[in-house]
């Protein structure tokens, strides 16, 4: 507005934000803890301004994501200077998302979690075998539970069965690394098939129990031929059977 005496006139002038000083003013996580299924996304919002805090529309922001996560390499700010960034992953854990423009950079961490809906027995390994069939000494197995993309799943309940009269806990729970050890005892010598399952996923491994020589005993002694001639040649015969304390 210009004025003199009682005379004045006004005109509008426009100042525009300075794209030369474009910077990442804010980078915030707006959704976190998405499932690591390659489809569900964590989201962030970036805001671009000039050096004096004026919002900048139509600016190209470069984006990178760590730990195997997927993100569009560039995004463009809207009229308010903000832009939403969507990040997906098939790898559970933390992903560092970095947004940059000119020489201005900001980073935030987002977290992807394993998908319990696709829990499966990834492997079942015998870690101790050939235990004595005394009902106390145990064969051991280790099961590992993951989601469909191989991410470890903690706190999952695994069902367990053992054949040939062996004894095991009916359920076990996985540790933070997705594994759990399974103890199996038996009083019956021989092979026991141990089966673990979760959802529709099942694996089996055989373990072997051996008779306990420490408790060897004569279980029975039977005459199988008697009344032979006393000629020093013809023999009477008997059959002895030796077992451990549990009849193995």
Predicted feature residues:
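The feature marks long extracellular or luminal low-complexity segments
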Residues: 1-248
């Amino acid at each position: 507005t210009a004025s003199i005496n009682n005379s004045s006139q006004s005109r509008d002038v426009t100042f525009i934000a300075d794209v030369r000083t474009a910077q990442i003013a804010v980078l915030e996580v707006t959704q976190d803890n998405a499932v690591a299924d390659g489809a569900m996304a964590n989201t962030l919002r970036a805001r671009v301004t000039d050096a004096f805090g004026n919002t900048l529309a139509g600016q190209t922001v470069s984006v990178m994501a760590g730990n195997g996560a997927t993100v569009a390499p560039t995004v463009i700010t809207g009229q308010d200077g903000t832009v939403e960034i969507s990040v997906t992953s098939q790898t559970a854990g933390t992903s560092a998302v970095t947004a940059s423009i000119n020489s201005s950079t900001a980073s935030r961490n987002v977290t992807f979690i394993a998908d319990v809906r696709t829990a499966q027995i990834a492997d079942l390994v015998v870690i101790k075998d050939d235990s004595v069939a005394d009902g106390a000494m145990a064969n051991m197995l280790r099961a590992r539970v993951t989601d469909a993309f191989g991410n470890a799943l903690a706190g999952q309940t695994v069902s367990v069965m053992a054949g040939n009269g062996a004894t095991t806990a009916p359920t076990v729970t996985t540790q933070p690394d997705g594994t759990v050890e399974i103890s199996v005892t038996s009083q019956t010598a021989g092979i026991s098939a141990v089966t673990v399952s979760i959802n529709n996923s099942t694996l089996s491994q055989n373990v072997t129990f051996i008779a306990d020589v420490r408790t060897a005993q004569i279980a029975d002694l039977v005459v199988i031929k008697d009344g032979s001639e006393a000629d020093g040649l013809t023999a009477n015969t008997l059959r002895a059977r030796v077992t451990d304390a549990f009849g193995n």
